[in-house]
Amino acid sequence: MKTGGLSDFADFGEEDANCTQGIQWIKDVFTDCVDTDLKLLGFIIGLISLALWLIPLFPQLWQNYKTKKCEGLSLAFLFFWLVGDTCNMLGAILTNQQPIQKIIGVYYIIQDLVLWTQYGYYLKIYNRPTTSSARSNTIVVPVLALASVGSFFVFESALPPVGDHRVKRSFLESLNHQEGLPLEGILKMWPIFTSYTDMLGYIIGSMAAVCYFGGRIPQIIKNYRHSSCEGLSLTMFYIIVAANFTYGISVLLATTSWLYLLRHLPWLAGSLGCCCFDAVIISQYYLYRPKTPLAEDTERAGLLNSQDDSD
């Protein structure tokens, strides 16, 4: 392995394509070129982030099950989270990522759908009787998302297999070989994107980052209006902060050029930006948590002492 360093735009494509000094199994499984000590450290931290991302919803799901309530969750927060995970999933399919990345994308969506199911059940069915129309309004979003993901798998499996004379090529892949398209000048002007498929994956990744980033705002507003974070799992947000922070660090450690940093900017901003918003939610949790009798007595004594001093 060689030592790491930040270089210019020109070396990105060559280094990424060859990876002669990298660890081969990492490139085969994760398509990452790990050929420096810093990249190896970043890859290890990235694996930690990946492991953390497998479990963040479990504390919230368990709390919902124990309390039989989901009122503390903002519906907009859940919606943006589901849309963000769906965008990640579609991006992995459209850019033909490794199977492990597609499987993880499906896993995220399954977790989201379980959370949506809990939300609909405990809010609309468990605690009070409801009509079928009200139930359908609650579950329509996850059902549509699941149908969309399923349709992409059906479409992908319906494509002809690779053979001696037949090549399985999607519409997006065929676009990469077209000449004279309006966006061709953009690809040649500045080598941020290597193909139209690559550009579409970047756009979808940016949409996911915006959903993750902006989805926190409705939850923060709801906590502020109710002066309460009851129903939210503090453990979930701690895990999310740790996962986002370790992911951001892994990207920064793997950076070898300004172009690499620019290509990963949406995901980097989405992860580190979410840390800031999640820190606000965590601070709200401690600010709005119910006071213990001892704390109330101490606060009351302090007020009485201040009144005596003023007299």
Curated annotation (Swiss-Prot):
GO terms for cellular component: lysosomal membrane; membrane; organelle membrane. Residues 1-37, 96-102, 160-189, 255-266 are lumenal. Signal peptide: none annotated. The keyword Membrane applies. GO terms for biological process: intracellular amino acid homeostasis; L-arginine transmembrane transport; lysine transport; positive regulation of autophagy. It is found in: Lysosome membrane. A motif (Di-leucine motif) lies at residues 303-304. Disruption phenotype: Mutants are viable but develop slowly. They accumulate enlarged lysosomes and show an impaired lysosomal degradation of phagocytic, endocytic, and autophagic cargos. The chain crosses the membrane at residues 38-58, 75-95, 103-123, 139-159, 190-210, 234-254, 267-287. Residues 59-74, 124-138, 211-233, 288-311 are cytoplasmic. InterPro entries: LAAT-1, PQ-loop_rpt. Disulfide bonds: none annotated. It comes from the Eukaryota. Glycans are attached at residue 18. Keywords: Amino-acid transport, Glycoprotein, Lysosome, Membrane, Repeat, Transmembrane, Transmembrane helix, Transport. GO terms for molecular function: basic amino acid transmembrane transporter activity; L-arginine transmembrane transporter activity; L-lysine transmembrane transporter activity. Residues 55-86, 214-245 form the PQ-loop domain. Its main location: membrane. It holds the Pfam family PQ-loop. It is a multi-pass membrane protein. The di-leucine motif mediates lysosomal localization. Belongs to the laat-1 family. Amino acid transporter that specifically mediates the pH-dependent export of the cationic amino acids arginine, histidine and lysine from lysosomes. May play a role in the degradation of autophagic substrates in autolysosomes by regulating lysosome function. This is Lysosomal amino acid transporter 1. The gene is laat-1.
